[in-house]
Amino acid sequence: LEVGTGSGYQAAVLAAMGCRVTSVERIPELATTAQERLARLGYGDRVEVRVGDGSTGLPGEAPWPFILVAAAAPDVPAVLTDQLADGGRLVIPVGRRYEQVLVLVVREGAALRTSSHGGCVFVPLIGEGGWR
């Protein structure tokens, strides 16, 4: 699951690596443009773009083996960690609006193992699971 489709660049890279991607974008125009671009590039069969509040993931389709968030949250959203499969990984920038740390969360049964992987700056994650 990718949260924050944007231009579709990250989804295209993942598709080129052989991944099937479901991506959620909150801005309808970005979602439409990205889906068209991905189809034009030959990734339309590997990437599905949906419009919605990606900050809450897609709980109806969980569990996910991997959730990649392309926007920063103030904290790791439990609504996303709850959707991880056993052994699943969540990568998300966490912190203040203009200064974050890239965080990896791995589900190990009922436990979550969290590690930080350096500073970064992403746009804010807007929605119920992020900045409101």
Predicted features along the sequence, with ranges:
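Conserved nucleotide-cofactor-binding alpha/beta core module
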Residues: 1-112
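Core SAM-dependent methyltransferase catalytic element
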Residues: 98-132
